[in-house]
Amino acid sequence: MSRHKVYKAISSYVIIAIIIIAIVAVVGVLLLTRHPSSSSVTSTTTPTTSSSVSPSSSGPVIVYVAGAYKAIFDYLAKQFEQQTGITVDVVPGGSFGLAAQIAKGQPVSVFVPVAYIQAVELEGNRDPGWAIAFISDQMAIIYSNYTTQSPYWNQLYSNYTMAMKTNESQYWYNFFYLLTTKFSLGISNPSSDPEGLYAYLILKMAGYLYANHSFDYFINLVNHNPNVVSAPTTADFVPDLATGKLDFTFSYVSYAISQHLEYLKLPPWLSFGYYPNETSWDSFFFYKITVNGQTLKIYGNPVYLYITIPVNASNEQGAIEFVEFIVDHVQELSMFGVTPITHPLLFYQNKSDVPSQILNLLNQGVLQYGGNFSAV
């Protein structure tokens, strides 16, 4: 074979080899583009947003809590984060208003309404069907040192002290009459905030007891007092109380303590504290509220703080751990002026709705069964 032919054959083989290498390289690039490595997926994937709520096992634990108890949950969140490393975001507001937000699909892990278990049912299709009552509180009439400078303060306070000492109806009548006509008074919206609902129930009780069984007597006085103001939550009144622009509001004892405000304690039959002898009396009174276009007749009951996990909760596993943590640390909360329930009460509509971890606490005797929602 001549040198020219050999050279031509070698050249042909080289060209074929180059073509094969090029084809392999192109195919390899295409495969890498279509099938990135697992480490590439982890580093480049970003969460997508959706209008529907779906459960998640990561991210912070988002706690929707009745606004008066924000200080308690700021404390619990810090302790929980230190113990588990899981971040907790505390979102305060009126219980009924928060329930409405949850029903509309807002992301939330844990819901902590106060006073009325109906707030759990107002979550709509995210109602989990269960809740735990873990502390009790009671209503009081809140004020600041500025209030004591009012020209009617001495008259009001003397009637209050005599009423608490003697329980004579005339002193109580004088007290509530002065409160509702001679002072500026903040009452939160009863359709968004249970504190406002309790305020109107207390006024109905006072009218029935001290104004010839007239349920609406003191409510009518409030409605005709131009110095009575409303707000979505009681927290909205705190700045004006602290600066003397507002004289009084109705709130929980624990909230007054957490805000370093003064308060007038109410007797058991007006405070909605957990007094077993008063529960049937409390439930004799009702007030109508409207939430999401729905009118509800709400009967009086003790001030409980509930905790539950809505359906399709964000970071559901973290939410369960947070609930377990609270049950385990409930006795610590007495420093906030509330009464811990030694064996918190588990309420549910159907046992099958309750997470297995929560049922285990019931079976172990850590929780006690409180009944279905209608029992509250």
UniProtKB/Swiss-Prot annotation:
Pfam families: SBP_bac_11. One of its GO terms (biological process) is molybdate ion transport. Keywords: Signal. Residues 1-31 form the signal peptide. GO terms for molecular function: molybdate ion binding. The keyword Secreted does not apply. Residues 37-57 are annotated as: Disordered. PANTHER family: MOLYBDATE-BINDING PERIPLASMIC PROTEIN (PTHR30632), MOLYBDATE_TUNGSTATE-BINDING PROTEIN WTPA (PTHR30632:SF16). Belongs to the bacterial solute-binding protein 1 family. WtpA subfamily. This is Uncharacterized solute-binding protein STK_20340.
